[in-house]
Amino acid sequence: MTFTEYETVLELRRYTLHPGRRDELIELFEREFVEPQEAAGAHLFGLFRVPSSPDEFWWLRGFRSMEARKEALETFYFGPAWKAHREEANETMIDSDNVLLLRPVQRGLTSPPPGSELYLSLSAPPTAFATFETEPSPNTFPQLPVRDDGPFSVWFSRSASPSGVLLEPTARSLLR
């Protein structure tokens, strides 16, 4: 499977949640927010627990372009699914603004070979199957802030590295 069509612009969203509420948010998110975002033009291909941080939820959302990102986010966040469930989702969160806006260093994000663990790393191991760097374009949807204290580089790999973070896919994560 390739995600090339949707990897032109990538958000790595890292939420800090109130203690003990991660699974509550994941259940709500997977039930109410995946299909509406996909219908709006976003592609959600990674939804993760972070075993070392039980009150964090990380996820990846891709877009064809910055303009497509703007349109998809306007459609979703001003639409019925978010309006119906935003309070419930926001009640689980302490912080949802730790967001990296990224672009591919090399096109061709493909599903890695099957394995039991997936890592996000801040220094590229030789086994990296996807590499991204800060997207320098202005944020086209300022209602959702993105970090501007970069630049950042992010790699995904199947093997651990000293600077990596183990990610555990949720039931609906396409990256496994």
Spell out what each predicted region is:
Residues 17-26, 123-127:
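Short, surface-exposed ligand-recognition loops at beta-strand->loop->(often short) alpha-helix junctions
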Residues 9-13, 25, 37, 57-63, ...:
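Short, structured motif recognition centered on aromatic/hydrophobic residues
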Residues 2-5, 28-49, 53, 62-100, ...:
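An amphipathic, aromatic/His-enriched active-site/gating alpha helix that lines ligand/cofactor pockets
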Residues 91-124:
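Surface-exposed beta-loop interaction hotspot
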Residues 2-21:
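An N-terminal domain-start capping segment
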Residues 1-5, 112-115:
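Short, low-complexity N-terminal intrinsically disordered segments enriched in polar/charged residues
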